Every structure is written in structure tokens, then in C-alpha cells.
Amino acid sequence: MSSALLLAPGDLIEKAKRELEQRSIAPLLREKNSTEAKSKLKEDGEKKNKSEKEENKIHDDRRVESQESEGSGSADCQRGAGSRGADCATSTGGGDGGAGARTGIGGGGVGRVDSRSGGRGGQGAASDGKGVGKSKTGADRVANDGATRDVGTSEVSSSGITSGGLQGRGGLVAKSSECGGEPLDRTGGCSGNSKTEGEEAKVGGGDRRIGGLATQGIADFVKKKIGVEVQVFSKGMSNFFTVDKSLLKRGGLGREDILHQSDIVKEIRASDKKVKIIPLSTVKRMIAEFGGTEEDEIKAVQTQSSSIRYISNRMEDVSRAKAMFTAPTGDEGWKEVAKAATQRPNIMAYVHEGEGDGLKELLHLIDHI
């Protein structure tokens, strides 16, 4: 019996994976990149460029506003000098949070404050006496005994918070030593990770059912019965599956496997009650837990005399294909493969146009070629 190759759509091959494995047919699938991946990459690049342009425009607008505001403050300061005893002084902060402008009462006039931030978020206004200064943002600052607070804004002093600076218009970015330097969110917590320990466990797969059988001999017995490989139990698994003793005896397993299974059950009940013991009393129960097919059906499949040993949706396999099966599909590259295959004079082509996905018809074709 020769080894032949069958062409079929990729999504149909994926659906038939278990049945193909039972028939010892190897799938040869085209890599999922090409058109779909290139389209997504192009779309992501366009979005990134658009985002960068918008961000640059925002920065430019803010820089222009800042320059206009500084120029206006300087002009006002010059116009007010010398009238009614007004005194105007400007100071630029430097280093880490340098102090801002200082002002006092000159005669009967009230000084104007022009505060410029310097270093990493350094800004503020202070007064030797009692006075009212007006900042560029329009918020009134009340200075008294060297302590400064903002009136009508949401900026307040907080212990354990290092100065961050102003972001946008009045948006304070603060970092806390308790959060390991991560930014604080508006609820007062660390914005870097807001999940609880239980949520983290679920995300990490802690709630997934992981289990196994007592010995490799029992695992081989289960595979023979339902055609599914089940791993051997080890520490850290959350479930231990026990196969009924009568099933094991009828399957020809020795006394050693049965006793080892009993010993693990006793050990779990005595010391590790977190592990769940799940009994498998029948073959149908095994299928319910692990999937698969009953032994008689597996034997019937294995005795089928099909010459097909490979199934593919790749263009490079068209030249050596014996037959082609096609059906409505979501495989984007399949149209070109099918077109190339039909140009060969000696290839057998089968088309599914009825209801359903064509899986049953594909397997029927495989078993009769």
C-alpha cells in the first residue's frame, strides 16, 4: 500500500485532528502568517504613526501656550513696575523642585507672581508675610507662614509621595515608596497591578484541572481503551484519577499497579486533602473525563485500508498530491492551492457543496481511497 497525500482546507484539517491521528495520517499545515499577518502588521504601523503625530501635535500646542503665557507674564510685570509701589520679582526653580517666585506687599500694591517650574516638577510660591499671588494657571495660592496649598484644585500634600510634576492641565503624577515607585491611581492604590491574589491565580492557570493516573501501566490501559494519553500523577496536581479495580483486572494489569493506586489514595486522604480523588468506574466515564473513543471504534478505524498518509493545505505539496477535497472554508490561502491543483490532469478532485462543514465526507473519502 503506497503512501499518498490528500489536499484539503486548513480549518477542516484542524477539525479532523483527532480522527487523522487515529488513522496515522500526518497533517502538513501552512504557517498562519502571510496575508493575514502582513495586513495586521500594516494596520498596526498606521495606527502607531497616527498616534505619534497626534502626540507631537499636543506637545507643540502646549509649548506654544507655555511660551505665550511666559511672555504675557513678563510684559505685565514690566507694565506694573513703579506704579502704586508694585514690586515684581521672578525666580526660576532649579534642581529637584526648586522654589518659585517670592512676593510681598510694596506700599499699597499687591505683587504678581510669575512662577516657572524647573528641574523635576519644581514649582511653588512662598511669601515672607501674608499676601495673595496669582499663578499662570489662574488658581489662587494662599501663602502663610511658609506653608503653601492650592485653593480650588485637587493637589494636596501626601506623606510618602515623591513629587512627580504636572501632566497636561493640572493632572498630578505621584509615585509612592510603598508601591515600589509605581504611579498611584485615583483611588489611592498602586496603578501597576490591581488584581487580587485569587485573580492572579486564575490568570496564571491555578484553577485549571490538572491530574493524572497512578502508574504508567494504568495510563497505557486507558489509552488502549479510549485512545487518549493521560499523564502519570505527581505532586502539585489537583486531581487524582482512580480506575476501577475490576476494569484493571480484566485489562490484565498486575497486582502491583492496583496496590500502588490504593497507596496513593490513602496518602492523599491522610496528608493532602486539597487533591480531589475522581473515580473512573466505566469506559464511558473515562471518555467523559478525557474525551476519546471506545476501543471497538478505534480498532475499526485502525483496520481501514486507506492509502492516505499525509494531508496538506500547502502550495508546495500540490505536485505530489493524489487527490483533493474542497469545501466552503475560511482558509484564506486555500483558493490558490485548489486552483493550482485543478490544473493537474491526473489529480482526483472531490467537492462538498451540501450542508455541514464537510468533515464527515472528508473522513469517508480518506477511508475509501
Swiss-Prot record:
Keywords: Capsid protein, Intermediate capsid protein, Virion. InterPro entries: Orbi_VP6 (IPR001399). GO terms for cellular component: viral intermediate capsid. Residues 92-111, 162-171 have a biased composition (Gly residues). It comes from African horse sickness virus 3. Pfam families: Orbi_VP6. Residues 29-66, 196-208 have a biased composition (Basic and acidic residues). Its main location: virion. GO terms for molecular function: structural molecule activity. It comes from the Viruses. It is found in: Virion. Residues 20-208 are annotated as: Disordered. This is Protein VP6. Belongs to the orbivirus VP6 family.
